Structure formats: C-alpha cells, structure tokens
Regions:
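Noncatalytic, solvent-exposed loop/strand surfaces
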Residues: 1-159
Length: 159
C-alpha cells in the first residue's frame, strides 16, 4: 500500500524499487498518496495532491518531501481533496475541486500563486463538502469545464 517509485531498466522489461512510502498512515506520510490527481514530474521533482489535500513537492529520486501546502486544493485538510495539474509554458493551470482555476509557478522553492478565479459551481458532494471532480479540457486558447448541471467555456487568450 502507498506510493513507491520504480526504476525501469533501459535494456530489458525489468524494474526495481527506488523508494517506498514512509509514515504511519496516508495522513501521516512524507511522500505522495495521489488518489485521483495524476502527479507531474519535472526537473527531478514530483508535484501532486496527497490523499488529505496536501499539495506536495517531492524529490523524484528519493521521495523526500520538499514542501507542502493546502492553499491550492481546499485551503485546509480534506479527505480525498483533489486538484488537476496541467503544465503551460513556465506555469501550471490548477483546477481544484472548489471550481477554481489557479495559475501558479511550481518549483522546489515553493508554490507561487499568480492568479485565481472561480469558474464553475461545485455541485456534487463527498466527505461533507461540495465539489467538482471533473478534469477540465484545454483547446483553442480556452478552458472547458463541467459539473453535474452545465458545461462552461472560458477564453484563456492573453488579448
């Protein structure tokens, strides 16, 4: 159970364990228990959402936690809290379960929020909170989002 990093052989269908999760539970862990969010790996670091809503940065080679923050996800601990990450140029689009689109820079130095806008109402419920758990689509300089009631499109063009 829990996260682990596999090292794949280049010359054969073989893998070895690079590191495994440490900690007493999913709540008390140093790594990344990514339940719904697909983590993003860049420049030797992993960015993603842990199962209690902690947005984290880890060293990919060792699993060492560099930093974490609840700010981009729900602002506080929340079981199965979620956000989706999409890289765009030098920043990330982060769509959280509150319906916010966040533009941020992620680095081993930390989470730097550039802007945030609420784009769609959370219409579903889980663990006592309203949420939207659908991944947005990006095309033609626009973002497309949906909840259980509607589909919305917003231009992301710089003009």
């Amino acid at each position: 159970n829990g996260p682990l990093m596999m090292r794949l052989a280049k010359d054969a269908p073989r893998a070895t364990v690079a590191w495994r999760a440490t900690g007493r539970s999913e709540r008390v862990t140093q790594q990344l228990h990514a339940i719904m969010c697909t983590p993003f790996i860049e420049d030797g670091h992993i960015y993603g959402v842990c199962s209690y809503g902690q947005f984290r940065c880890l060293k990919a080679a060792t699993g060492e936690r560099i930093w974490d923050s609840f700010k981009p996800v729900t602002g506080a601990e929340g079981r199965w809290a979620n956000a989706f990450l999409v890289k765009h140029e030098d920043r990330f689009f982060i769509h959280n379960e509150k319906g916010d689109l966040i533009i941020a820079k992620l680095s081993p130095k930390g989470y730097e929020e550039i802007s945030r806008a609420n784009l769609i109402e959370p219409t579903n419920f889980a663990r006592g909170r309203k949420l939207v758990w659908s991944h947005p689509a990006f095309a033609n300089k626009s973002i497309y989002l949906r909840n259980d009631k509607e589909v919305r499109c917003y231009s992301l063009a710089a003009d």
